[in-house]
């Protein structure tokens, strides 16, 4: 088996570590170095390429462990189509993951690796800091798949794969104990264990420390305990909060090791469930700094006997904490059963009630009762309690049902003393066939977006952050409830997309506003946007719940989850501690929460909340309107609600709008048109197909306009994903100018009329049907974006503006819903409003009503029909405003252009929901353009509110032309429109000339015909199948603004061509509205080219034929009103264009002065019905034709009176609007000429340049000298130049040699350019351009024709093609897809590119890639056989040399003797032999003088006694070469040769049926197989013999071949030989050094003995000399 394992072993790719079979780890995980992005990309590219090459048919999956944020790994691997699964690298600071996540990882890994029929691979990767959790997960995977046994052994093995310092560097505490605990959890689990597991809830009572650790330096500590984990009272498994500490810091007691022999008990009292992290911290004497003593992570599922015993071995401590803990340290974590009736946290709090700073004990326990015992609250309520049971239940509601206490009856206690049982208050959840598991619950609860909106207008950001940081948060079924010390409740939503953008934009507004006044005003602005940002969804099951009050806060939030949007509305009072109504939607249930405690009683008007379903099916849907009215009593008494629950009617509607009003200091006395009171309990809204209309108007009774006295909606700042706001807020943004300049006048929420006894009937038609035209209560006008919104009426001038380019579709939709202002209305005015007769809904609205929500284009402009009072029912229309004087003005370039689309709208759009199209109604709204400021457009009210003017800044930008209507959000719809005959979208208009931009202006529309009945009605110009403009409704009303006389005209520098948009034609009768669109909608015309003169030129009027396109709108959008639509539409005839303008006319007739000497140019003649006859207007007349213009820019005359014929414009009339002139090289329109006058075209210059003679010779690209300096060479040449100096050159020959080659096809340069642009390319490319280029580059290296190359390849001629060229050919063989592409090509194959020709040549040979590979194998076969045989012979020779060496045997015997001598009397003594790696330990055993080792001693002994053994290593000739070889690599090479020959034989058999094309190939290949077969067989036999010799060598030295393979044997012996030779050489050097030293000493002594010393008297002194003399 060991041989087979080595035989089939495949070396893993470089930079990967194989942990288990098909489980690899990137080696970058074991390093702390950080690679640059480019280097990291190359690192991954190389690994993936190697994996693709080695495992061609395998699939890869990457598990990445990382922190939060964007991961580079996912993006890189996605380029290769490799799946990446991201996991966090810590859980609450502990390098572990929750048990359920660990099980998910293990199950997924096992299924991936065990997938039948596939060989999948797992790649493990961790980003910086993720190695600890990756090591744990790897160990868990090995244990889970039964590849290893023993948790600690497996974990230590994985730890050792990385440097030891890496784990200490990444973690402050040693995570091994917690890792082992969770590995034991994994091993305890078997197949019968329920997964996912259901953790058992416990109450963590206390932590007992049996030994006191030393953390204060004097043998003691001051401990506290913190517990982190899932909040037990919520169902959100991701809501990980810090549970309350055992004691406050200031009450933590200090314990000593010796003085306190008793155990330390730290009370906790927290509810825990699932994965829990317990930390024990030491507080220093200053009570400020803390230090973590130990940490424990565990799961409550495995708690046994209500105790978790701990000791020093199974707690996470710091790496140097051994000195602080004794080895006898023990601790215990005690638990108790969780009791739902009494929360343990109450008991713990009561233990320290003297330490908690609260007002009183009663207040404390009352608050605890509210927050923790929701199932046992009972008492009185001030609001009506509604309970609706549905037969359907969503998975989220099913999940809610499994939550704690969800099946209990809800009882509310109010007042503490008096408690009344509410019989009907039961949270009912009907169970459906659909079951929601906890795993699905995780999916439901993913993507939680916590959008927090705060409370007070004067609250600073720091205060908000401080308040939010101290929150104790929990989440109940998608609705996060954060409870903080200030007794405020912040309700946030989950899974809301467009709401995020709204909050972000508002956050940016606040960040750019400096003063509190601006912040106050901004928060008023965003009331309607917050309340209309999300549609209210279908509610299947509605329950009620009453809870605590939240003072001084006002939040409106919306939630959406799992295709069922959940609405979370909290309406609260801003001033004082007033009664608060809360309506919370939990999944499919509604809980209405009134205030329990009030320090002082105040009366308010009840809030009314409207809820409408967003349905997705054709069956009946439920919409409900809740009328929540608190009984107002100034004495503070409560209204007992023991009466049965009030019913609410279910409505089959698609769009509603709910108008809310809050007024303080007064009792609500809201009446309908008949004076009936509004404190009624039920409401019935009539279904109206696709719209809601009302005969009443929302009013505001005694509404204060002071922002400080009004109810405010505040926004709490919270960080979100980044959004580009450069286009939203420029330094001179109109948003900021508007916010800083506009007053804070605000119309507040008006009460809802709630009494109706008529039952609603579903309506399937597209008309606005009413059950009663004059019912007692008026229905409420409702607007909608997609579906109904909870909306408030806000001062429209305070609404923030957005540029189209910076907003997404969802967020742009939310900006279009603008309610009409009604700040001056009173309730008495309601009697003047009657129901407007129903209007027909065009068929396009009916069709759009059935489209999906995401197909509706949001950019809709609607002018709402007025619902006039009886007094003004037949009031004639107001005269049109006079045009402004002709004054030129310029605009600042740095300002941001505001879409005229937004400037002109009075109400938000009315796009269809899933089943209806809403038509918006507003009351007394009219439009007026003249303003007191030149940059504003006024939108005024009707007669009832004529004193109110809304100003919208109209500032434009010059640098970038924009489309009139944003088109980015409707690409899919536009494609659909084109297929169904809809409109195409025009290209963007060309830019203006610099000198023409400053003269463009906006014309004013003309007055409509008489008899409009005072109703302002326009169509909703949506770009969905409807064309540029829809047939207008009957009437248009204009009102002059008396307070702001015009001062100067408004000029838009960005307007196309400087031409004013033509005025709107008179609309046809209403009965023709829906008929006029049946003939198809004409397409939008292309944009006008830029003008060339100094003054703009008016565009031509629409042609008389039906379906004539209107002129394009200006780039900035629609100025006030949409462009005029074509009136006809039934016919498809096209009229001839308007006659051109004669020469000399350079401008448009200027508008008449203010005095009224004429109006603006009248609209063009409308198209007729199938015959060109103009349709009659409301009075039966015809539309007025354009006035006869005056010559040379004169003032236009008055329009033709109604009834007059509409003669066409005769050609050549001065002053007529010409067609769009050509500009800067563009040809003029047909039949027209270029505009002559102030702005001349450059055509003359271009023509003169074109007529200039061009040289026919090739140019010499030199640097020209135009001025010869005095004294220079060129100056002298100029003086001496004469006519004969150039005669020596033959000019004709020069011209013939250097002439420009004539073009093969005639035509001028422009003709050639246009022809080359319009004609097809010479070569047709079917293959990817990059691959084609690489193929052509490769073919340049093969310098032979393609047929010759193929012949050489089929002949297996290695003299023509080498191995490198074949590798390139194999790499660029066509794939199956490319072959199919070329086979399906039916065109001329001669026109194909070189790459395609090459592929076609290869496709002529069957299985060409296989043949190339056979050819490459044949070329490399002999060299491969030779190399493998040589290496195998080297291994075999080395084995024979080692086994046959007698000298080595004697040396091993002597080493055995020395070892037994040293180990005599120890367990290691009396050994019969020793392991081979013990040879290397001879150098580790040193003598006393530290210069001699046992190896030196061995060499010395052998040199003295057996010198013939010292050269034993000379017998090992092949040892060094063999040590560099690996049998595994040789096995792969040998197997490659064998498999290669098998493929050769397979191809030989397959080529039998190829026919003549493979005849030569088959013959040559047959000869090759006959000769190579014997070589392969002999090689296999040699490999088998070598394998046996290698195993025999291991057995010879007493080793197991499986544990000590051949490579290890040879490397060990080679190292021993090196150490032996080194020691022997050192011994020789030492002996020589000793000899030299002894010789010197002997010579020195001899010299001293031979030298006599004479004394002073001449006698010889025999005594030795003193060294000091």
From Swiss-Prot:
Domain C2 tensin-type: 199-338
Family named by the database record: Belongs to the formin-like family. Class-II subfamily.
Designated gene of the protein: FH12
Basic and acidic residues bias (residue ranges): 1036-1050
Domain FH2 residue range list: 1247-1646
Keywords, alphabetical: Hydrolase, Protein phosphatase
One Pfam family linked to the record: PTEN_C2
Species this chain originates from: Oryza sativa subsp. japonica (Rice)
Lineage top rank: taxon: Eukaryota
Region called Disordered, residue ranges: 688-709, 1025-1240, 1631-1669
Domain Phosphatase tensin-type intervals: 5-193
GO MF: phosphoprotein phosphatase activity
Protein name according to UniProt: Formin-like protein 12
Gene3D superfamilies xrefs: 2.60.40.1110, Formin, FH2 domain, Protein tyrosine phosphatase superfamily
Transmembrane segments: none
InterPro entries: C2_domain_sf (IPR035892), FH2_Formin (IPR015425), FH2_Formin_sf (IPR042201), Formin_homology_domain (IPR051144), Prot-tyrosine_phosphatase-like (IPR029021), Tensin_C2-dom (IPR014020)
Residue numbers annotated as active site: 126
Ranges of biased composition (kind: Pro residues): 1060-1069, 1098-1127, 1136-1190, 1198-1230
